[in-house]
Structures are given as C-alpha cells and as structure tokens.
C-alpha cells in the first residue's frame, strides 16, 4: 500500500490581536448574521475530527464525533471572484478555531488558529489568510484558498491523515465535500 505523504498539516496557533471595528448605522446590514453550521464528509464517508491540535479525516461511525464546520460569508468584497465561489470564513463550531492558510517551508499550509469566527466577520478589512472561496461542483462543495489560488482543502483517501491544502486535485486526495446543514 502506498503511503500518503502529508503536504501540509493543521496546527492550532495562539491568537493574534485583531483590529476590530464597530458597526454604525451605515454598516449594520450584516451585523446580526451568525455562522451556519454543517456536517462534512467526503466521497469515502470520511469525516473531520479534531485530535489534540490536529484536524484529521476518519471513517464515519457511531464511535466518532466529527467536528461541525462553521461557515460565514465575508462582508469585504475586495477579493470577490464569483467564478470561484462565495467568499467565506471557516471555523469549528463551539471552538474559537478558524481555518487559516500560511506558508511553511515554502509550501501553502492549512492551519487552525485561535480566533473567533465572528471577530473575523466583523473586521472592516478581511484577512486574506482566513478567506476561502466556497465553490459548488455538482452536489459537492470545494474550499479554495484565497491567499493561495489553486490550493484546495483536501482529505487523503487513507484514513487518519491530516487535512491539508493541495493543488493536485483528484490525485490521491479528495477536494470535494458533502456538507449537510446542522439544525
């Protein structure tokens, strides 16, 4: 069996201070918005779990408690590209953990950072590292990094591998996910 070499890892990093803005009567159009929550799995029924500070994909079962993905639209339209999808922030429900793209050892890497998703939403100018294009392909969703165009969130076809960023779609990795609204 061929091993899947990790292309990047998801690690939890300490929070950075975030400059916030206060909504006024001109900017209240989205201030009461809250994230939507989704259960996520890939075509091989792998779900996302948080093991320590690492996000991995494991086969769905009654013994597994998958994370719930929180998703909220970005109000800053600077990086909007309707061909790629909607601009969103991604986080883990009931955790102050958000998906972030950084460069490590010369390669785009997916990380979890200790940030409240609503703080990202309320910022006047969006931080590009936290932004993803949420695209729809058939009945699946794809999440492409805004900071690293052409790099997508992916799971390995081998269980218990770290969730990564990849630019090699369809080669040993899954970049298309089924998301189901959690009520």
From Swiss-Prot:
Disulfide bonds: none
PTM (free text): N-terminal truncation leads to a dramatic enhancement of its activity (>1000-fold).
Pfam families (alphabetical): IL1
InterPro entries documented for this protein: IL-1_CS, IL-1_fam, IL1/FGF
The entry's keywords: Cytokine, Cytoplasm, Immunity, Inflammatory response, Innate immunity, Secreted
PROSITE patterns registered for this protein in UniProt: INTERLEUKIN_1 (PS00253)
Superkingdom, natural source: Eukaryota
Keyword Secreted in annotation: yes
A Gene Ontology term for the protein's cellular component: cytoplasm
GO biological process, one term: inflammatory response
SMART domains: IL1
Compartment(s) where it occurs, according to its Swiss-Prot or TrEMBL record: Cytoplasm; Secreted
Propeptide feature ranges: 1-30
SUPFAM superfamilies (UniProt xref): Cytokine
UniProt-recorded Gene Ontology molecular function terms: cytokine activity
Family recorded in the similarity comment: Belongs to the IL-1 family.
Subunit and partners: Interacts with cargo receptor TMED10; the interaction mediates the translocation from the cytoplasm into the ERGIC (endoplasmic reticulum-Golgi intermediate compartment) and thereby secretion.
PANTHER family tied to this protein: INTERLEUKIN-1 FAMILY MEMBER (PTHR10078), INTERLEUKIN-36 BETA (PTHR10078:SF24)
Function: Cytokine that binds to and signals through the IL1RL2/IL-36R receptor which in turn activates NF-kappa-B and MAPK signaling pathways in target cells linked to a pro-inflammatory response. Part of the IL-36 signaling system that is thought to be present in epithelial barriers and to take part in local inflammatory response; similar to the IL-1 system with which it shares the coreceptor IL1RAP. Stimulates production of interleukin-6 and interleukin-8 in synovial fibrobasts, articular chondrocytes and mature adipocytes.
Designated name of the protein: Interleukin-36 beta
Source organism per UniProt: Mus musculus (Mouse)
Gene expressing this chain: Il36b
